[in-house]
Curated annotation (Swiss-Prot):
UniProt organism field: Escherichia coli (strain SMS-3-5 / SECEC)
The keyword Aminoacyl-tRNA synthetase appears for this protein: no
Top-level division of the source organism's lineage: Bacteria
This protein's name: Ion-translocating oxidoreductase complex subunit C
Organism taxonomic ancestry: Bacteria, Pseudomonadati, Pseudomonadota, Gammaproteobacteria, Enterobacterales
Cofactors that this protein relies on: [4Fe-4S] cluster
Biological process according to GO: electron transport chain
EC class name: translocase
Keywords (A to Z) from UniProt: 4Fe-4S, Cell inner membrane, Cell membrane, Electron transport, Iron, Iron-sulfur, Membrane, Metal-binding, Repeat, Translocase, Transport
Length: 676
């Protein structure tokens, strides 16, 4: 009974809410085998073909490259891209890529040489002897990404799963109309796909491996069953055809009955999902040693004469693939990259094929029908009934149209998988997916701006905190320096105290002189001589300063000379008028007169040696000379009119008269010199 229940649960499948059943339109392209496309003359390889940042360039313009040669380096989540063929790098510049707005991204442009030479390939046939880390690194460096449409780096996804993965799901549903790339790959390369699944299982070591495939692919189902005939570790689950059963959350629920939590990932419930195309790329990377340089692309639509599935080199222009398939465009021809529900219209055909390109749809006017005008929402709730994510598309539409980002976020717009089921059933022909895509892009931009603002605020606060810490540390250092002297200051203070103590000790010690010896006073004498020399040097410096000040001002010098002469004459007059009983020693008088004359000559010499630019005013000099002559005449007259009882020594009078005449003569000469 338990075995029966276990077997029943093993094959049980669940059903999700919502979903639609549009026309499949798969028979146009799934009936012919995979074929190769002739090489294009020029390849455009965008550096970013996956979720995450672009890699670092490792080639330059003019370099020769081989097929499989890395064009960028992959570090962290950055996935490298590789040359799709051999040739020459002719440019590295922005180029329009696979995007609804054909945004330009940095790309490497290669001109093919037609030889299509590979780099040396090193396959790992013994991959089971390799460690988990080695296999993940090889998968990452060979550029393998999710080929089901998301483009998430496979190596990063495997690394993030860790040891908590219990169920490995291989997505082979391919539920969107027109697309048959995975269907044809399983028909033609079923053994290689299974080998890639085994490599993934060796890395993850899951408890069970499930392949989910819709029942509208009978040939692929039969091929997989034939390859898995002797395998008991891989289970093939055939599920009913329903759109969008190929969604990650929807297929997880169908096969396991587990729901991925809101805002979480499938790895949170022990599930990891990979696409069949990704499994095939893993096999070629690990066993064959070939980086991902091509993928299967469906070429379909009534505007294509030879629809089918082709091996398209990454970087091949869309125009080249369509022309090879017999593209017959109409006047208003539309080309869609992807399916009719989740794809987008290309603005022009020069965009390249990338890793997430699974279909190129060129429908005729009859296939699409007449375009319907968008009308107002009638709140019929048909979109809510069809939504596989259990959302309220009509409410999200109003929030998106009214720029109510908070309410849109509250109503879980991030859980929208953009499957297009709501727009398919809308009777008002409202392009709901376009509104939701735009709203999610605006919310992402707002969050990115908020993140940048928060980071800038954190940097500012960290800087302010650092400055405050430095200021506090600086104040603390200043306080410590004020309270405690530095080490060198302590040493200097200690040395000074030691010297003082030594001198005090020497002063208190008595001087003992032995008999017959003389005391040694050489140190005292040397100190005394040093003090005398220092005093003389200081006095000489002071004298030089005074002399310089005297020479610097010629008028001051002249005034001092006049004062000296007046003092000399006053002294002579006092001597002449002295009473007879107060006779002055003639030798002393002669000495004083000689000193006065010497001072006068010194002052005149300093005045004569003054700087040329410091000349005395000639008029002032003439006035001084006239005053000196007048004073000399007055002195002579006073001497002549002196009373008889006050006889003056005739020699002194003669000396004074001679001095006066000499001074008058010098003043006159100085006047003549100044006038010249």
């Amino acid at each position: 009974m338990l075995k029966l229940f276990s077997a029943f649960r093993k094959n049980k499948i669940w059903d999700f809410n919502g979903g639609i059943h549009p026309p499949e339109m798969k028979t146009q392209s799934n009936g012919t085998p995979l074929r190769q496309v002739p090489l294009a003359q020029r390849f455009v390889i965008p550096l970013k073909q996956h979720i995450g940042a672009e890699g670092e360039l490792c080639v330059s313009v003019g370099d020769k490259v081989l097929r499989g040669q890395p064009l960028t380096r992959g570090r962290g989540k950055m996935l490298p891209v590789h040359a799709p063929t051999s040739g020459t790098v002719t440019a590295i510049a922005p180029h329009s890529t696979a995007h609804p707005s054909a945004l330009a991204e940095l790309s490497v442009i290669i001109d093919a040489d037609g030889e299509d030479c590979w780099i040396p390939r090193d396959g790992w046939d013994d991959y089971r002897s390799r460690s988990r880390e080695e296999l993940i690194e090889r998968i990452h460096q060979f550029g393998v990404a999710g080929l089901g449409g998301a483009g998430f780096p496979t190596g990063v996804k495997l690394q993030g799963g860790g040891d908590k993965i219990e169920t490995l799901i291989i997505n082979a549903a391919e539920c969107e109309p027109y697309i048959t790339a995975d269907d044809r790959l399983m028909q033609d390369c079923a053994a290689q796909v299974v080998e890639g699944i085994r490599i993934l299982a060796h890395i993850l070591q899951p408890r069970e491996i499930l392949i989910g495939i819709e029942d509208n692919k009978p040939q692929a189902i039969s091929m997989l069953r034939a390859v898995l005939a002797d395998s008991h570790d891989i289970s093939l689950r055939v599920i009913p055809t329903k759109y969008p059963s190929g969604g990650a959350k929807q297929l997880t629920y169908i096969l396991t009955g587990k729901q991925v939590p809101h805002g979480g990932r499938s790895s949170d419930i022990g599930v990891l999902m990979q696409n069949v195309g990704t499994a095939y790329a893993v096999k070629r990377a690990v066993i064959d040693g070939e980086p991902i340089t091509e993928r299967v692309v469906t070429l379909t639509g009534e505007a294509i004469a030879r629809p089918g599935n082709v091996w398209a080199r990454l970087g091949t222009p869309v125009r080249h693939l369509l022309n090879d398939a017999g593209f017959c465009p109409s006047a208003d021809q539309m080309v869609i990259m992807g399916g009719p529900l989740m794809g987008f219209t290309l603005p022009w055909l020069d965009v390249p094929v990338v890793k997430i390109t699974n279909c190129l749809l060129a429908p005729s006017a009859n296939e699409l029908g007449e375009p319907q005008e968008e009308q107002n929402c009638i709140r019929c709730s048909a979109c809510a009934d069809a939504c596989p994510a259990d959302l309220l598309p009509q409410q999200l539409y109003w929030f998106s149209k009214g720029q109510q980002h908070d309410k849109a976020t509250t109503h879980n717009i991030a859980d929208c998988i953009e499957c297009g089921a709501c727009a398919w059933v809308c009777p008002s022909n409202i392009p709901l997916v376009q509104y939701f895509r735009q709203e999610k892009a605006e919310i992402a931009a707002i969050r990115q701006e908020e993140k940048r603002a928060a980071e800038a605020k954190a940097r500012f606060e960290a800087r302010q905190a650092r400055l405050e810490r430095e200021k506090a540390a600086r104040l603390e250092r200043h306080k410590s320096a004020a309270v405690q002297p530095a080490a060198k200051d302590k040493d200097a203070i200690a040395a000074a105290l030691a010297r003082v103590k030594e001198k005090q000790a020497q002063a208190t010690q008595p001087i003992v002189i032995k008999a017959g010896e003389r005391p040694d006073n050489s140190a005292i004498i040397a100190a005394r001589e040093a003090r005398k020399a220092q005093a003389r040097a200081k006095q000489a410096e002071l004298q030089q300063t005074n002399d310089a000040a005297t020479v610097a001002d010629p008028r001051k010098t002249a005034v001092e000379a006049a004062i000296a002469r007046a003092k000399a004459r006053k002294l002579e007059q006092q001597q002449a008028n002295a009473e007879p009983e107060q006779q002055v020693d003639p030798r002393k008088a002669a000495v004083e007169a000689a000193i006065a004359r010497a001072k006068a000559r010194k002052l005149e010499q300093q005045q004569a040696n003054a700087e040329p630019e410091q000349q005395v005013d000639p008029r002032k000099a003439a006035v001084e000379a006239a005053i000196a002559r007048a004073k000399a005449r007055k002195l002579e007259q006073q001497q002549a009119n002196a009373e008889p009882e006050e006889q003056v020594d005739p020699r002194k009078a003669a000396v004074a008269a001679a001095i006066a005449r000499v001074q008058a003569k010098k003043a006159a000469q100085q006047k003549v010199v100044n006038e010249d």
